[in-house]
UniProtKB/Swiss-Prot annotation:
Gene3D superfamilies: 3.40.50.20, ATP-grasp fold, A domain (3.30.1490.20), ATP-grasp fold, B domain (3.30.470.20). Its EC number is 6.3.2.4. This is D-alanine--D-alanine ligase. ATP binds at residues 178-233. SUPFAM superfamilies: Glutathione synthetase ATP-binding domain-like, PreATP-grasp domain. It comes from Prochlorococcus marinus (strain AS9601). One of its GO terms (molecular function) is metal ion binding. Pathway: Cell wall biogenesis; peptidoglycan biosynthesis. It comes from the Bacteria.
Amino acid sequence: MIGGKKKCIGLIFGGNSNEHEVSISSAKTVFQAFKSEINKERFTIRAFYINKYGDWLDSDSSEKILIDESKNKNTTKKQIFNQEKINFLDGVDFQNVDVWFPLLHGINGEDGSIHGLLRFTKKPLVGCGIIGSALGMDKILMKIIFSNLKIPQVNYLVFQNQDLNDEEVKNKLIHEILKKLNFPVFVKPSNSGSSLGISKVINKSEIIPALEKARGIDPSILIEEGLEVREIECGIIGNSKLLTSEIGEVNYKSDWYDYNSKYHSNNKIIIPAEIDSKISKEIKEIAIKSCRALNIFGFARVDFFLEKSSNKIFLNEINTIPGFTKNSMFPMLWKASGLKIEQLVAKLVDISLDL
């Protein structure tokens, strides 16, 4: 970097969550973006891989995983942190980092865990803080806050793990679902991403298996009424001033937008989405309002439902560490808005330094 020191980016990826492989794919994209010609004068990058057991690998070993994923990710020779080594933040690998870029999707990362840990390094990080991350991960708490702000959402019910352990209580739950919601309904673990653990339920007999599946991932369970909708998404970047991207739509071919649809299907991505300008404006306004409500800044992707019959907007959820894979909407939205991936990652670092 002419006239100054290059910023060293600490890219953290992997993690002991169900979204481990998605995180690796996202990290590959971001790693290459920082290595690009337009960024090499400004940045150096160090990769830090966390395996599925929660052990951190050294930067050289981590980089090899991003270059050659066939490397054995769980037996790489050098570990810089494990359960017996708690002073890892003093390690040489960490001392040289100027800005952290966590790309841990799901629990133990996107939920604010990594943000709390990295706070002790006293180095800036890309993305929002602990509170915004935790609220963005917890679908139920998110919905409660949105309800208080009168932000439109689909009808929903909330249950806890222990509710399913008593037969009488369980029967009451089923009765409540049948009384208050119309089929189909979607049963979701409150703390999960990439549609993992979610089931589409079309009749009474499918309710209990779906609840059991969801509580296998998280003890808090969300049940939402399903509507005939379009999947609409909006990107957010910024701090004191939040900027919105073009609006995008995912036109998926499967019955609903599940994990396979997100990462293993040839979905049609439409950017900008073919919607009325008034609806687009309202979606952007709700996106900013919802991020402000949860103290979310840095970057995020805000997901909406647009009911096909009425064009009514429903806020679905906010993703505080959206995917950066080849199929991910977030970088596509910003590319359509004038920021290529190389420019986007640099912009996110600049935002983190502007706090």
